[in-house]
């Protein structure tokens, strides 16, 4: 794989960092206690016997990454590496509630690809690590806990930057504005954010479609690689003929839906309401149920 300069937004290690939430602080405190005892192998810092070598072997190798666009490959590698860390963290008693929720939802929705399941692996993995959060004022996710631990451990800033982008990502509803060989041009509803994003499936799409996808920001400084990445298989919305406004386009139907939902959320602006809704829905399982119940059809690279 060719080398590219990765944005080193966080160049200073945070040696005194204690974590943003109570779970992360407990995880870091436990790690600190073991590190002070000179137990420096993280594989030994756990409850039970964790096979760190076997987990590390599951990370995608550089030969496989050579087939990816550089930006996409960077995120695939980062997600694989972060998954290894999460697989170890999830065994700790401090993370028990999130771990239980993760396992329960995995069993209930059995992510795969239609016709086996409309919940794709790419969707569920990102949702369960970044959007599934604890209750209370300090909402923590598996990704946020992993990122906080990496900040404390002074993980390489380039890799940490990718971890942070994964953690902070969310789904969004985008209007298809046209596509070419590699890229799709999208405009997000409500935020009106216009982006050029790498397509990561063979589905070209059609102008005017609405895509429900997780789009990641450019990871590189280089201008010629400054494109976003569509990180999940597109869910393509089609008009709801049972909707009470059947004369409206699918976009108009969603805008009416937003008008009804946003006032019920305790946020200040429509953009904040939209971002909250995209990440958390109206309940923990809201978007999983939405995808499960809304499934109509699929083709290679897109689900309707």
Predicted regions and their residues:
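Mixed-charge, low-complexity intrinsically disordered regions
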Residues: 1-172, 204, 217-304
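Conserved hydrophobic positions within beta-strands
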Residues: 176-178
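Residues that form ligand- and interface-recognition hot spots within folded domains
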Residues: 180, 190, 215-217
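Short aromatic-glycine-enriched beta-strand elements
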Residues: 182-186
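Short, structured beta-strand/loop micro-motifs enriched in basic residues and often containing a Trp
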Residues: 188-197
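Short nucleic-acid-contacting surface segments enriched for D/E, G, S/T with interspersed K/R
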Residues: 198-214
